[in-house]
Design a protein with these regions (language model features):
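IMPase-like, lithium-sensitive Mg2+-dependent phosphomonoesterase catalytic core
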Residues: 1-18, 22-27, 32-298
């Protein structure tokens, strides 16, 4: 008789990622307090589920997050993760529970404006990787630090201090099934990498998990280029700027890497709406710069 672990595994993952979202936000806020950031009362959130934005009266921070990056991989047991970004904002986002009609709409619009900030306004970002080990990477704008969950003591232990992504690499992480749909500059660069005719003269290999957290985590440790570029089918790519692209770009840049759409820095783009999508390439600075140079010469 064949037994399936799918229902129990999915239930476990759902519970686990909810716990880690709360844990990550608490850790980040505590760190912000320790580093003498402003007082925290309550926190507003925007996430990748159906409920776009939740704002509480008097909050000092806005947390944006992707609860379970790579959720389509759950059945296959492939690494998944959680992405979180935290922004600071003004005190003018207070919703009166007695308000009605246009007054509420105006106040809610102000709350949304407080959420739609460029990545340059991030005060903290983190991701948690759920794999053979549970890793947490955090930045407060002064380097990237990784922690591994030690199950024997039930605590996160510092495993990598002041992470620096190697400037050179020979690995790229992209879904090459879409190669024919990519922009010509990107195709030319990747073709050169595969053939060993790129700027480095080294032949690249492909390593693609299909989970942004998993691929970026490996890139931070070993070097490489992670990309989810736009193509003829999805011109703007598929990653969400506010709660995927910007927080992960903050982490990558703090580790000494580059993150771009190919034409502009991801961190400098102000979202126009919560689920706005953008193309992304990030990683080792010399390899990513080769892509940027190709676009600039187009």
């Amino acid at each position: 008789m064949l037994l399936s672990c799918r229902p129990h595994y999915i239930a476990f993952v759902v519970i686990l990622h909810r716990l880690f979202i709360s844990l990550l936000i608490c850790i980040l806020l505590l760190l912000l307090l320790l580093f003498n950031k402003i007082q925290v009362d309550l926190i507003g959130t925007a996430n990748s589920d159906n409920q776009e934005i939740v704002i509480e009266e008097g909050e000092k921070y806005v947390a944006v997050f992707d609860p379970l990056d790579g959720s389509s991989n759950v059945d296959a047991g492939i690494p998944t993760g959680t992405i979180i970004g935290i922004y600071e904002h003004s005190d003018n986002c207070e919703i009166d529970p007695e308000c009605i009609g246009d007054e509420c709409t105006e106040l809610e619009a102000q709350c949304l404006a407080n959420t739609l900030q460029p990545g340059t306004n991030l005060v903290a970002a983190a991701y948690c990787l759920y794999s053979s080990s549970t890793f947490m990477a955090i930045t407060l704008g002064n380097g990237v630090y990784m922690f591994c969950l030690d199950e024997t003591i039930g605590e996160f232990v510092l495993s990598h201090a002041n992470v620096k992504v190697p400037a050179d690499c020979n690995i790229y992480s992209m879904n090459e099934a879409n190669f024919d749909k990519w922009d010509a500059p990107l195709k030319n660069v990747v073709k050169g990498w595969r053939e060993g005719t790129g700027k480095s003269g080294e032949r690249f290999t492909s390593r693609y998990i299909g989970s942004m957290v998993g691929d970026v985590h490996r890139t931070l440790l070993y070097g490489g280029v992670f990309g989810y570029p736009g193509d003829t089918k999805n011109v703007n790519g598929k990653l969400r700027l506010l709660y995927e692209g910007a927080p992960m770009s903050f982490i990558m840049e703090q580790a000494g890497g580059i993150s771009s759409t190919g034409k502009e820095r991801v961190m400098e783009i102000t979202p126009e709406y919560v689920h706005q999508r953008i193309p992304v390439v990030m990683g080792s600075k010399n390899a990513v710069q080769e892509i940027l140079d190709a676009y600039a010469a187009e």
